[in-house]
Amino acid sequence: MVTMSSADKALKSLYLGVVTQQLNTGVNPFLAKIKQSTQDVWGKEIRRLAQYGINGGIGAGTEDGDLPSSAGNNYEQFVLSLKNLYGKIEISDKAVRASENNVGAFVNLLNAEMEGLLNASSYNFGRMLFGDGTGKLCSVVSVTDGVITVDSVKNLIEGMVVDFRASTGTAISSATARRILSVDRSAKTITVSGTALTSTEVPKDSIVTVQGSYGQEITGLKAIFSSTGTLYGLDRSTHKWLVPYMKTGVGTISETVIQTAIDYLEENAGSKVDMIVCSSGVKRAFQNHLATYKRNIDVMDLQGGYKAISYNGIPIISDRFCPEGTMYLLNSEDFTLHQLCDWQWLEGEDGKILKQNAGKPTYSATLVKYADLICAKPCGQAMLSGITEA
């Protein structure tokens, strides 16, 4: 007979390992390649020493002259708070009782819930890797008869629960925890649950975020590629080595544009690009460029079972969350996902995973991870934007 106790054991012993593996390597090739470590985690924070420049204790001199003065390595400390990442499943008591004498039916029930959790978590984690930590999904352009027009639907999907916020980030109390009912990708419009929103409630330039996630998401690639503001607690205006290579208004993509960025990183930061990430439109544009000049398109096998085209042995991968017209040239060895622990089930004092929801005939289980992403050498990364897509 199937019981809640046996379901608990299944979640711990059968599902956790598979889900962890999928979330660590199956989200996208970039995440599969970067390191994951519990080092440099102190309490609720990540504190990591970052070296920049070179050791100054070198020089040349006369046969009997003074030796060079010592001048050790340059260090600064990166500081980030661990972000709290959650995924939740829910099973009704009715569904459990209906399948208590049918193990196969209960397994199918759990499989369906876990597959849904895995898909949603993979989607959300993959999206965050390209964000700036604020959790902004898009901006509102207009609201007409409850239909919301936004500037981009790349980060939106049916079923997502979102909050609407003022452009300053302040929550709009009448427009929180709204579930997306439909997404029109050609018109860039969405509809949401609840009473119809108006342009007075949600004015132009309001922002959309995942429920309760504003300012709580991991520090993704967008946070790195800026020449102003702070990064990891340091001001870029006084720490110029935090500023990466950025070229805007690229237009037509070519090998020369890519090689110029790679050469800059090698000559000025000593960085070796080992992964290129771009939007699908940029990848198609590069493939068109190769075809125009009758170049062979080489295909590579990557960790995690992925395949990619290559440029001089460097894989070029497209990602659905990469901004349009953008290409990132990265040294994955500079990135580390610092974590307090790997994915775990949230357990009660009794050690149980599945817990009854207060006042409801349902049980829920929550998957958690406390982590954030740090790039040890931001100046060793590059971004090309304004690329004409195909």
Label for each model-derived stretch:
Residues M1-G59, A71-A390:
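Core alpha/beta structural scaffold of self-assembling particle/tube/pore-forming proteins
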Residues E63-D64:
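Glycine-rich loop at the start of a catalytic domain that most often binds anionic cofactors/ligands
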